[in-house]
Amino acid sequence: MAKEIKFSEDARSKMLKGVDKLANTVKSTIGPKGRNVVLEQSYGSPTITNDGVTIAKATDLEDHFENMGAKLVSEVASKTNDIAGDGTTTATVLTQAIVNEGMKNVTAGANPVGIRRGIELATKAAVDALHEMSHTVESKSDIAQVASISSANEEVGKLIADAMEKVGNDGVITIEESKGIDTSLDVVEGMQFDRGYLSQYMVTDNDKMEADLDNPYILLTDKKISNIQEVLPLLQSIVQQGRPLLIIADDVDGEALPTLVLNKIRGTFNVVAVKAPGFGDRRKAMLQDIATLTGATVITDDLGLQLKDTTVEQLGSAGKVTVTKENTTIVEGAGDKDKIAERVEQIKKQISETTSDFDREKLQERLAKLSGGVAVIKVGAATETELKERKYRIEDALNATRAAVEEGFVPGGGTALVNVIGKVAALEEEGDVQTGINIVKRALEEPVRQIAENAGLEGSVIVEKLKEQKPGVGFNAATNEWVDMVEAGIVDPTKVTRSALQNAASVSALLLTTEAVVADKPEPESNNQMPATPGMGGMM
């Protein structure tokens, strides 16, 4: 396909139009009085959202050059979302402000490379200042405040705070759709994996169709148990001690399964067999997680261990195990606390090093199961459209909360960005580098200005008043009052604010140093319409 090339001012102005079109759409959603955006779907009802990254990803412009500008803004939103999980609208607003000011100066003859250097210096100074003013998350109420602001809903804030209190900061919190209209929280304590009993005759509670084992031994192996003779000596030792047994193996079949069932029915001893969770290398890792949690040794050829030689000392144990048709839950594993902590750190390291989103998700699930449990927020709503919108809000709030736990929080509502302007203004450089610093200084005001304008006020007036206030005091656009933002519970995670600024500055600087843009040349539409057939009386 033929290409079309635009240079210098012509190229930058086209891309700037794309930046403005997308940013103007996204920035209408910022703040407590921000509006929603309706997105057309290829099928089903439209999506109504105020989530910046969702809007950015759904936007494609007709003009190829404008679309490239829009896609660069979309990249800022996506990157911020990947790192911090929230702050995508703030990142978009900052990008537009830096690009617009920068373009004016480049058009007037400033050197874009010098401007880029100034933007980088100013961004570093601002980020350092944000870290200095950051507050550590110390209580459940801090978590609730962060989540409430992000979701614009106090109930959601309390729900997320409850979830994090129950499963810990490293715990897995998943979001599912509820069948009703209410939003609720379910917590699964202990380690749960999606494998159920191999025979329904192993249940101990016929009403609930589940097997409850109190203080059981746990046999872990990656082998298939087909011959009962392989485990007979071990079973005899367990029968003598009168304790139940949970077998987690690659599979239990052949004569072994009916023999175990028969002994269970006769009351010889209480036993439940389940298949090991996962597949391949992930199965080995999960078996080792269970072994660490319960104090067991995995009977595997990798360690040169055989089932026939297994002793009671190689078994794990737990306070309680519940097995249903679909899930197995191990509570109060008897593993060594130091070894569990060591295993947790090992998984955290793997999470930080992996580049695959799928692997990261699976590692986080394993981490949560070792750390104490899984919480499920079941989102309810009256309509499907409202349900989607509410899910987006809760996902953002959850991500923001995790970010706050990680790096702390700063005064919200754009206040922190205005508060760091002093540190940026203290930088003294020459020429175009100083111009770049001034561009960032001006851009830091933009989120507050936009929040005020979305609330129907004059943004510049609010910004000037904010500069007169003491640090930490900001404008509450929901009530039109000046308050101490932290005391009022209006806070943003430091990681979210930092990531928004860094990503906006990075892409903006690249855009300003662009000298040529190459795009596909649109092909002329071929006129393949069939000519009207004569004699049809004009019925075309």
Swiss-Prot record:
It comes from the Bacteria. One of its GO terms (molecular function) is isomerase activity. Transmembrane segments: none annotated. Coiled coil: none annotated. It is found in: Cytoplasm. Its EC number is 5.6.1.7. GO terms for cellular component: cytoplasm. It catalyses: ATP + H2O + a folded polypeptide = ADP + phosphate + an unfolded polypeptide. InterPro entries: Chaperonin_Cpn60_CS, Cpn60/GroEL, Cpn60/GroEL/TCP-1, GroEL-like_apical_dom_sf, GROEL-like_equatorial_sf, TCP-1-like_intermed_sf. ATP binds at T29, I30, G31, P32, D86, G87, T88, T89, T90, G413, N476, A477, A478, D492. GO terms for biological process: protein refolding. Keywords: ATP-binding, Chaperone, Cytoplasm, Isomerase, Nucleotide-binding. Belongs to the chaperonin (HSP60) family. This is Chaperonin GroEL. It comes from Ligilactobacillus salivarius (strain UCC118) (Lactobacillus salivarius). The gene is groEL.
